Amino acid sequence: APNDIASFSGQVTNLAFLLSSQCKGAVAFGDYFVAFNYYVVKEFGEIWYEKLNCISTSEHHIISRTIKDSIEKGMKQFIWGVNQPAGNRSYNSPFTNVSWYDKYYFKSLFEDFYYPDGSKPKWKQIDTLQRMFMELMRKIRLIKPITFPVTTMALVHNNKEYLDNDYKELCAEEWAKGGSFFCYNSDNPTSLASCCRVLNEMSDNTFSSTTGMTGVMTGSCNVITLNINRITQDYFRTVDTNYFGNSGILYQDITEEDMDGFKKYLIDILERVYKYHIAYKTMLYELEDKGMLAASNGGYIYIKKLYSTIGVIGYTEAAQFLGLEINNNKEYKEFLQL
């Protein structure tokens, strides 16, 4: 098991590659900051957040680092690690998700969670780590357009307003500064969503792996992305002979009959994707039942906890191909709702 920030960051990065190589889907660390905090406390004490500007290196180090620098170094190790291409994934990076929480989400999910030494995570610790990570991701993206981890902010509301006003303001400020993350709004803080996946019930939260992670399990076992631009152009250029080879198609000139044909063409593709997802997940269930999935054997994740995901890209380009203006107009919204 890891015993400091560096070894924890290295093992979590390796775990992302391990899990994604077995399922070819998206790995979600819904408890990254809770686990990360355990090793920060082990190195710098319970109130490390009050000592961020204190020097943590000795006179023997060429590079002088503060406690904040040392913590960010571990975060960078994880961020840069999961953005490396992997040979067993056709040289793609492992699709990695990380969740942020407001105070009420944190209390609901981790109020009764204990670390191996009997201590408990404190909100001030997690809050500080989340803000540091958020700022670090934004700064790194000014240098390099990194993809992962995809981050999702989970906020609790009462159907009228957000309960944690500080995190409501934090989200607005980060978006205004150019931060990029999803936001999941819920009136039920026992459920969790990451990236494009639907919510996952978190009330059964019992297992802790050797990485120090909690029992929060979420992710995707398979991701298939539909390129709407490619599908649209294929149909109107090749399938529907009324528009064969025509690169100047206008949305308003498409007949209702032809639009119905396009919808059927899209549905046929979706049905093939559904069948592939079902077949692939059935195979994973069979492997799991036979004890052939190391991730399940180790208790990291179970196939029933994983979603089969359909991604969508190319809507804007498809609309432009059909001569639509990309703004808040009736025809564009109509096309998006096909």
Give residue ranges: language-model regions.
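Conserved catalytic cores of very large enzyme subunits
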Residues: 1-304, 325, 329-338
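Contiguous, well-ordered alpha-helical segments that form the cores/surfaces of helical PPI scaffolds
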Residues: 308-321
